[in-house]
């Protein structure tokens, strides 16, 4: 259990999951929550991330920041998705470790599991066969973040955990017609269809 006075950094606080984490923490009485916008702190820049962690020394970190998108975005910008996600993950996780962060929660993705994994999917399926090609770059970046946390735990005794959300939607989600995930895209289409129907 975290102390109510603990300094908590939520990376990705403007996104769907990050904003939900903030709401949950505030509802539970945590008030010493640190956030930074992308303009204030570029997580892909190691020097900026190191300086931030050295100055703030957060005790707990929720790493929900990521470059995300649906199948179209993932398949059109493979290099961008891999580079940006790997850079921000490694920078934040490494800076947290170097600055004595007590616990870190890394937000992974269900796309890290093989395309043809048996259902229901088990964690042991990780790295057993091919990934889905349309989001392979994103998946590889997320696997790298998960493994880096695992290796820090094994080598240095840190308490860094990875969680894999599946099919999320909610406030602050991306409802773009071609660059969102399945559920928000469907919600948008339903809403647009209902709006057109009510105008008739």
Question: Predicted segment positions?
Answer:
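SDR active-site strand-loop-helix element
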Residues: 11, 36, 61-67, 104-110, ...
């Amino acid at each position: 259990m975290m102390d109510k006075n603990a300094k908590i950094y939520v990376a990705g606080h403007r996104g769907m999951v990050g904003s939900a984490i903030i709401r949950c923490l505030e509802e539970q009485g945590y008030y010493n929550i640190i956030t930074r916008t992308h303009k204030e702190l570029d997580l892909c820049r190691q020097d900026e991330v190191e300086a931030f962690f050295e100055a703030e020394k957060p005790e707990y970190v929720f790493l929900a920041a990521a470059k995300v998108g649906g199948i179209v975005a993932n398949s059109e910008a493979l290099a961008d998705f891999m580079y940006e996600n790997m850079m921000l993950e490694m920078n934040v996780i490494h800076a947290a470790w170097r600055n004595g962060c007590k616990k870190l929660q890394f937000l992974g993705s269900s796309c890290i599991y093989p395309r043809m994994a048996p259902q229901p999917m088990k964690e042991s399926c990780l790295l057993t066969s091919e990934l889905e090609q349309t989001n392979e770059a994103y998946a590889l970046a997320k696997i790298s973040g998960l493994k880096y946390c695992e290796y820090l735990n094994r080598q240095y005794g840190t308490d860094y955990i990875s969680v894999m959300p599946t099919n999320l939607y909610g406030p602050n989600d991306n409802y773009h017609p071609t660059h969102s995930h399945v559920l928000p895209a469907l919600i948008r289409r339903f809403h647009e269809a209902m709006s057109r129907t009510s105008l008739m």
